[in-house]
Amino acid sequence: MTDMRRLGQRAKQASLLIAPLSTQIKNRFLSTLAKALVDDTQTLLAANQKDLANAKEHGISDIMMDRLRLTSERIKAIAQGVQQVADLADPIGQVIKGYTNLDGLKILQKRVPLGVIAMIFESRPNVSVDAFSLAFKTNNAIILRGGKDALHSNKALVKLIRQSLEKSGITPDAVQLVEDPSHAVAEELMQATDYVDVLIPRGGAKLIQTVKEKAKVPVIETGVGNVHIYVDAQADLDMATNIVINAKTKRPSVCNAAEGLVIHEAVAARFIPMLEKAINQVQPVEWRADDKALPLFEQAVPAKAEDFETEFLDYIMSVKVVSSLEEAISWINQHTSHHSEAIITRDIKAAETFQDLVDAAAVYVNASTRFTDGFVFGLGAEIGISTQKMHARGPMGLEALTSTKFYINGDGHIRE
């Protein structure tokens, strides 16, 4: 038996053991875990330093190092996310609908756990805790497979979770970490249909595509963020400038950062110099501009076709000038990764049209796309941002990690 199969078996067994846990027990444990994370900050930072040192040795970019880095403040934020999950209403056992049918059968539809969730993710070690807390609150066991660059951090975090579970009298196998970073083991996890009920990949386009091609278990696709901001003809240009600067430069390595800028031709000649001057005072950006936008910049390079399809995760942004709202919507729908999109406008009708017709999980009017986040949306720590339409869409909180079951009660009923 392979190590992966042993992990799968333990997770499956654990899912049965934690299925009956009450809301009170789950919430008490999550509060305990939140405190343990803060108390054990120095141990977690020491493990993270090993990952950062390895990353530096291998020439990882500063932006990608930021994704990997833990700090005292970030650990505190992770702990706050766990506590927020504890404070959320428990969806398990929630009655979605109940009725008596024509035969007199009493039928209830309730929320139930999925069972065993597998998570394959890259770089960001906070995902280990975020994913576990949501899975545990919904009575699911979870198997975590992080990237090799965050292995020391993930091992320390999962060790802390398992120790906390054991101290609380709960099976530590509710969380499993795949420590082997090989692609063969990851592929085995993708095909573990005997043990895994759903697989959630969280990372770049290459990871998502690999999972889509190789997985045999059901997959919820997440994460890739080719995110656009459209500056409309009726935009407040000062507002647009502030929003673009925030969405591009605040944390360019995250999936809700803006990658593409679409500008109405009526304001392009005013807006582009204004934006370029303002953003250079914060953080210079490499502009990859189309033929109409290029001469309006002091410094830019001609965009290639692939630039409009790329999640840069860096201080780089594609720029497209359009002649109408309809062209902007068409362009965005052609190039979107269905994550988050935004329009800056004072035209209420244009805003409504944009929100109705743009095909994305989150569509903003006059706000930065950086808000697409489970914590910000009040869902607690998110397990990912789904870019598909089934079974979940957008930031995935507790309800996204549940299924439903029909409970039918009769009194000797038979069907003629």
Curated annotation (Swiss-Prot):
Transmembrane segments: none annotated. Its main location: cytoplasm. Keywords: Amino-acid biosynthesis, Cytoplasm, NADP, Oxidoreductase, Proline biosynthesis. It catalyses: L-glutamate 5-semialdehyde + phosphate + NADP(+) = L-glutamyl 5-phosphate + NADPH + H(+). Pfam families: Aldedh. It is found in: Cytoplasm. One of its GO terms (molecular function) is glutamate-5-semialdehyde dehydrogenase activity. GO terms for biological process: L-proline biosynthetic process. It comes from the Bacteria. One of its GO terms (cellular component) is cytoplasm. Its EC number is 1.2.1.41. Pathway: Amino-acid biosynthesis; L-proline biosynthesis; L-glutamate 5-semialdehyde from L-glutamate: step 2/2. NCBIfam families: PRK00197.1 (NF001221), proA (TIGR00407). Catalyzes the NADPH-dependent reduction of L-glutamate 5-phosphate into L-glutamate 5-semialdehyde and phosphate. The product spontaneously undergoes cyclization to form 1-pyrroline-5-carboxylate. PANTHER family: DELTA-1-PYRROLINE-5-CARBOXYLATE SYNTHASE, GLUTAMATE SEMIALDEHYDE DEHYDROGENASE. Belongs to the gamma-glutamyl phosphate reductase family. This is Gamma-glutamyl phosphate reductase. It comes from Streptococcus pyogenes serotype M5 (strain Manfredo).
